[in-house]
Amino acid sequence: MSGKKAAARLMIQGTSSNVGKSVLAAAFCRIFYQEGYHVAPFKAQNMALNSFITRSGGEMGRAQVVQAQAAGLEPDVRMNPVLLKPTGHTGSQVIVLGKAQGTLSALKYHGDYQRKTWPIVEEALHELLEEHEIVVIEGAGSPAEVNLKQNDIVNMRVAKEAQAPVLLVADIDRGGALASVVGTLELLEPEERQLVQGIVMNKFRGDIKLLQPALDFLEERTGIPVVGVVPFYDQFKIPEEDSVVLEEQNTSKRDQGKSRDEALDVAVIRLPYLSNFTDFDPFEDEPDVILRYVREPSELGEPDCVIIPGSKNTLSDLRFLWESGLGEKIIKFWQEDVPIIGICGGYQMLGRIVRDPLGTESDLKEIAGLGILPMETEFELDKHTVQSRGKVVGGELFLARCQGTEITGYEIHMGRSQGEGHSLFEIEAQETAYGDGMSAGSAVGTYLHGIFDNDPLRTALLEWLWERRGGTRPVGETMSQAAIREQSFNELADWVRNSMDMEKIRAMMGLHKG
């Protein structure tokens, strides 16, 4: 033993999915970071279509990337050693320590394979505990799923291994929060229940005085203190974990009330297997943009720009475009000179054909693309995952405004595309230089996720779209994405800190009062 003081731990578990665990974990990461601690996030297993590529080329869940940024750290795949990316209703691609291991059915994964990943999870957890002063751990779903408990590697088994005090979070905005807390605790084993040292009511609306009798009841019934009631607030500009947030509405709350006269209309196709929709978060931060997600042709209207996003199942989503009529509508828009942008899987769909002879994504062997870009794509077994850096070299459309501009992004794809056009970007990644992207008429495609996080490129696009309307952009210079992110982390930390009994939380963690 090195004699080094053991890291303090705190684990956030929930009564169900989507109660706010990821955001609260990010808040605690920033709170402790502000207090001068060296803090790291950890989630043993995540299931999400939003992923990120680390500097070393490893793939991990976006939520832990956000938490790492809140903690002032470079993302590390050990923070999310197991990532499941759904490829269909019953199967997922399994990614372990950043590398794809293949696609398994839910039944096969929750059997032997999940048990085999526990030593990897265990090692990653203990390494982070050795290297940091505090580790903020996030659970998944609910710890009371009795049908999954036998092979659990993400909830109470992690809490026991880390000897971490657990905060149990309920979403009171949904209703039934008291029953969900009591029911969850009733279904836990006695030794698991002892680990739960605090209850948090999240997303509360109204006067807390009216809630106090319920809080008193919870404490008396469970013997566990309520350590926080976090008021509802949905304006934090923190990237969301998964596309469940898109199910509630097709237009961002930040965009409601904007008229088409004062804002550009950007329509993103809501693919069934849409991935990395955080690519479009920068548009939500622009005061002159309305960002919409559309599922069918009738919802498209007359957008200033149509974006086909990334996909975890490109061939199936391409089939969806054809069967829904969206494919024909997009082609018609392109013929009418409406700007069309494809990102990763969306880029592949813009080509002439997509082939998957080895069945890497689905049972479909090939399907006709939209035929807008002069290229063809074929899927291979090897997954290309890199952080990319480069510059704009293609002079088409809005890119003519930012020639030579340096850009960053990341790539996650198994398809290789070949075509006749000139590259739009000159990329350097892992000591290799290559071209990326293609354009034809009003259409542009690229493999780069995160492309719109590049402030000069995004600004060039928006100015170009306004000029196409016959006007000039009505807003001046806006905050950079980096500045917006930092401001949001600090606001989130203040919001949560002021809603929590931080003295009790520090005490359960073994920390002195900050």
Swiss-Prot record:
For this entry, list what GO says about its biological process.
cobalamin biosynthetic process
Which Pfam family, any one, appears in the UniProt record?
CbiA
Q: Which InterPro entries match?
A: Class_I_gatase-like, CobQ/CobB/MinD/ParA_Nub-bd_dom, CobQ_GATase1, CobQ_N, CobQ_synth, GATase_3, P-loop_NTPase
Please name the GO terms that the record assigns under molecular function. ABC-type vitamin B12 transporter activity; catalytic activity
Q: List the disulfide bonds.
A: none
Locate the coiled-coil region(s) and give their ranges: none
Name all GATase cobBQ-type domain ranges: 263-457
Task: Recite the UniProt keywords alphabetically.
Answer: Cobalamin biosynthesis, Glutamine amidotransferase
- Keyword ATP-binding on entry: no
Q: Under which pathway is this protein filed?
A: Cofactor biosynthesis; adenosylcobalamin biosynthesis
Which superkingdom does the taxonomy of this entry point to? Bacteria
| Catalytic residue positions | 344, 449
Q: Which family does it belong to?
A: Belongs to the CobB/CobQ family. CobQ subfamily.
Main role?
Answer: Catalyzes amidations at positions B, D, E, and G on adenosylcobyrinic A,C-diamide. NH(2) groups are provided by glutamine, and one molecule of ATP is hydrogenolyzed for each amidation.
Protein's recorded name: Cobyric acid synthase
Instruction: List the source organism.
Output: Desulfitobacterium hafniense (strain Y51)
